[in-house]
Amino acid sequence: MARPRPARTPERLPVASDVAALAGVSTATVSRVLNGAAAVRPDKRDAVLQATAQLGFVANGAARALSLRHFQTVGAVIPNIENEEFIRALSALQAGLRQGGYTLVLASAGYDLDDELREATRMLKRGIDGLLLIGDLHRPALFQQTARLSIPVVQAFTLSDTRPCVGFDNADAAARAANYLLDLGHRRIAVVTGIRKENDRGGVRAGGVAAAMARRGARIRPEHDLIVSFGIAAGCDALRQLMTGGGPPPTAIVCGTDQLAFGVLIEARAQGIDVPGRLSVIGFNDSDYAAYLSPPLTTIRVHASEIGRAAAQYLLARMAGQPTVRETLIPAELIVRGSTAPPLRARRNKDD
């Protein structure tokens, strides 16, 4: 008489601990991979993905989302993490992304386009759903990668004729500063910026000053067009160069950042140069301290937080498949304070 076969026990569905054991990682690592976290080594991520495929493991749809390249993560590669305006924008960007359920991951490239490409490539390999870049100058290979992966990209602090962007016209903003000085009567106007190689914004701002002066029949003397490093010390050094460069010194300086302008003010005081009596100074960004300098700094105000919020809105819409506007203009504005005045000669003529 044949014995009855025991009832077959249904096969147990694999769980996260099974994936962890097969992949040789912890269950926490499995969770991070399936939730799209970027902070997982590529070799461990690959091991987890292979294990989930081998076991047929699905956890609340996370593996399916991963296979569809949904990571709930946005990357940002910026030139300088010490720049106050970038930090303001990133803070607003992160707040907007957080409301949409996304995490922001950040890298700094130090004004090196090859480093920017490497950092962005790492992010793309680890998994991001969107990317923010600064400026309009980048390696073409970066956009080839994002296009192949259908990753939306937005450029900030600039405008572009072809790419999605959130920002302002750097040339127009700098021209506004130059025109204000020209209206005051200045003709010997210097321009001081940080590095312009692989930094389109510095060159565009200097070009905006030069173009505004040319339209008014003036020009920047070659010795008055300086490229320095970034920071307060660089501003101090710039004024020393301008005052010892031969020929008549400038009566006004347009600086590419407020930090450079701050350095100019410090060095002017050290040299006994009255600002704005003998020298007018204009900065760029309207940093928190600009209104509290002595004298208070005339500057170009950049609405960095608005730029960050608008960038978040653009990326969230693109990642959700919603319609978007390619260009979002957030104009910069001239803020007149106490570091600018008519040149001494113009004041004397007026008194006569």
Regions found by a protein language model. Name each.
Residues 1-10, 54, 95-100, 148-155, ...:
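Bacterial carbohydrate/catabolite-sensing allosteric modules
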Residues 1-72, 213, 347-351:
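N-terminal helix-turn-helix DNA-binding module of bacterial transcription factors
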Residues 57, 110-113, 134-139, 160, ...:
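Short beta->alpha connector loops
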Residues 137-148:
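Active-site-adjacent beta->alpha loops and helix N-cap segments on the catalytic face
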Residues 63, 117-121, 143, 178, ...:
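Short hydrophobic/charged patches on amphipathic alpha-helices used for structural packing
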Residues 29, 75, 132, 190-191, ...:
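Conserved beta-strand positions in the central sheet of alpha/beta enzyme cores
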